[in-house]
């Protein structure tokens, strides 16, 4: 069995790490490089960096920090933000990232997923999906441009359908960002994860809602996700990654120690 991954997520804006609640009201957490280093030393399996305003600003990730991160950590890391072409992706991978993640640009141009998978291999291509549960319709809807409160909007895709579509096009991994749970720390949306897991044949990463160690265990045991991504519990030192891994091991969950 493959070890379950613990993945701190660093939202980046203007060269600093920030964190919001339900994709709004972001506060500054600190500088990128020291945080990345701290998480790698604590035992993170991987890091994900989202340049949260790149897509809505119509630019690509600010690459200056990508190479600085690559110099100080020895675990894989993934970078997302405004990657609209193979050239954009190539530059980020050249700067030292192991994977690129695309979200809004994939919705605007689904062919991009295939182009990137063909050029760099599916193992490098992650598709991020921002999924919002609409209580009125009872449906999970995919949103885009979620890094900018003014521009964020629903797409025509329902989450489950988009999960199937991106796999057909060559996504090697899916990060499901559950918007209703984001930053609230009440636990992952297990029901939604199970719905997606049924149709997701590639590695699935849960994102949004981690508030306690048992929330990670639940996502692994009840929804069989491959990795769990979290931000505020790590940034605010509510949970230490080393201690989390010991706890998961005691629960009988395979992790890399």
From Swiss-Prot:
It is found in: Cytoplasm. GO terms for molecular function: imidazoleglycerol-phosphate synthase activity; lyase activity. It catalyses: 5-[(5-phospho-1-deoxy-D-ribulos-1-ylimino)methylamino]-1-(5-phospho-beta-D-ribosyl)imidazole-4-carboxamide + L-glutamine = D-erythro-1-(imidazol-4-yl)glycerol 3-phosphate + 5-amino-1-(5-phospho-beta-D-ribosyl)imidazole-4-carboxamide + L-glutamate + H(+). Its EC number is 4.3.2.10. It is an enzyme of class 4 (lyase). SUPFAM superfamilies: Ribulose-phoshate binding barrel. The active site is at residues 11, 130. GO terms for cellular component: cytoplasm. Gene3D superfamilies: Aldolase class I (3.20.20.70). One of its GO terms (biological process) is L-histidine biosynthetic process. Pathway: Amino-acid biosynthesis; L-histidine biosynthesis; L-histidine from 5-phospho-alpha-D-ribose 1-diphosphate: step 5/9. Keywords: Amino-acid biosynthesis, Cytoplasm, Histidine biosynthesis, Lyase. InterPro entries: Aldolase_TIM, His_biosynth, HisF, IGPS_HisA/HisF, RibuloseP-bd_barrel. IGPS catalyzes the conversion of PRFAR and glutamine to IGP, AICAR and glutamate. The HisF subunit catalyzes the cyclization activity that produces IGP and AICAR from PRFAR using the ammonia provided by the HisH subunit. Belongs to the HisA/HisF family. Heterodimer of HisH and HisF. This is Imidazole glycerol phosphate synthase subunit HisF. It comes from Vibrio vulnificus (strain CMCP6). The gene is hisF.
């Amino acid at each position: 069995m493959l070890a379950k991954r613990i993945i701190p997520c660093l939202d980046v804006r203007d060269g600093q790490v920030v964190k919001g609640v339900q994709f709004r009201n972001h506060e500054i957490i600190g500088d990128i490089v020291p945080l990345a280093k701290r998480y790698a030393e604590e035992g993170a399996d991987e890091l994900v960096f989202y340049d949260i305003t790149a897509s809505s600003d119509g630019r690509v990730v600010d690459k200056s920090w990508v190479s600085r991160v690559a110099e100080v950590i020895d675990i894989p890391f993934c970078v997302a933000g405004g990657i609209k072409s193979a050239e954009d992706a190539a530059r980020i991978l050249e700067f030292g990232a192991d994977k690129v993640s695309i979200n809004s640009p994939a919705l605007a141009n689904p062919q991009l997923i295939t182009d990137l998978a063909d050029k760099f291999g599916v193992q490098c291509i992650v598709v991020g999906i921002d999924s919002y549960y609409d209580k009125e319709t009872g449906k999970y809807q995919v949103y885009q441009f979620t890094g900018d409160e003014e521009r964020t909007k629903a797409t025509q895709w329902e989450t489950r359908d988009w999960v199937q579509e991106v796999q057909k096009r060559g996504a090697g991994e899916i990060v499901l960002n559950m918007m209703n749970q984001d930053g609230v720390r009440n636990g992952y949306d297990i029901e939604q994860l199970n719905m997606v897991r049924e149709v997701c044949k590639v590695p699935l990463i849960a994102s949004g809602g981690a508030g306690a160690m048992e929330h990670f265990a639940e996502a692994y045991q009840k929804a069989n996700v491959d990795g769990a991504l979290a931000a505020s519990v790590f940034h605010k030192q509510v949970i230490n990654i080393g201690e989390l891994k010991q706890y998961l091991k005691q629960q009988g969950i395979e992790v890399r120690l």
